[in-house]
Amino acid sequence: KESSAEKFLRQHVDSIDSPGNLSPTYCNQMMLRRNMTKGSCKPVNTFVHEPLKDIKAVCFQENVTCKNGNSNCYKSHASLHITDCRTISSSKYPDCAYKTSQEQKHIIVACEGDPFVPVHYDASV
C-alpha cells in the first residue's frame, strides 16, 4: 500500500520538469500520469518544481496551523516554483481537463513520521 509520504511524492513533487518550459497541457498530462483522474477528476492539485531535499526541508521551517486546525504544518521560508492544476468548468470525467497556472509561492505542508517528511499539501501563499 502507498504510504502517506509516497502519496505526497506522487501527487505533488515534480523536480524534473523545469518551470517556464511547461506546456499548457502539462496538467492534463501529469494528472493522468500520476493517477489523479481515476474514478473522478481531482479538482485542484499543486506540483512543486524544486529538488526533493528542498521540499523535505520545509518540515523544519516555520511551524504554522493547518487548515484543519492541526499543528503539524510548516511554511517554506522561500517562495518555490509551483504549478497549480484546476479542472476547467466544461471538464467531465473521464475526460478530465485542467488549466495550468505557473506561480512562485510559499508552500504549506503537513509533516509527520520518522523521518519527518511531508505527507499533505495544505496551501500555497
Curated annotation (Swiss-Prot):
Record's catalysed reaction(s): an [RNA] containing cytidine + H2O = an [RNA]-3'-cytidine-3'-phosphate + a 5'-hydroxy-ribonucleotide-3'-[RNA]; an [RNA] containing uridine + H2O = an [RNA]-3'-uridine-3'-phosphate + a 5'-hydroxy-ribonucleotide-3'-[RNA]
Glycosylation site list: 35
Binding site for substrate: 7, 10, 42-46, 67, 86
Disulphide bridges, residue numbers: 27-85, 41-96, 59-111, 66-73
SMART domains, per the entry: RNAse_Pc
Range of residues in the leader sequence: none
Gene Ontology CC entries for this record: extracellular region
Presence of keyword Transport: no
Annotated GO MF terms: lyase activity; nucleic acid binding; ribonuclease A activity
Highest taxon above the source species: Eukaryota
Gene3D superfamilies found in the cross-reference section: Ribonuclease A-like domain (3.10.130.10)
CDD domains: RNase_A_canonical (cd06265)
EC number(s) on file: 4.6.1.18
Active site: 12 (proton acceptor), 120 (proton donor)
Distribution of this protein across tissues and organs: Pancreas.
Keywords: Disulfide bond, Endonuclease, Glycoprotein, Hydrolase, Lyase, Nuclease, Secreted
Protein's cellular compartments: Secreted
Pfam families: RnaseA
GO biological process: defense response to Gram-positive bacterium
Record-stated family: Belongs to the pancreatic ribonuclease family.
Annotated PANTHER family: RIBONUCLEASE, RIBONUCLEASE PANCREATIC
Subunit composition and interactions: Monomer. Interacts with and forms tight 1:1 complexes with RNH1. Dimerization of two such complexes may occur. Interaction with RNH1 inhibits this protein.
Function of the molecule: Endonuclease that catalyzes the cleavage of RNA on the 3' side of pyrimidine nucleotides. Acts on single-stranded and double-stranded RNA.
Protein name: Ribonuclease pancreatic
Species assigned in the record: Spalax ehrenbergi
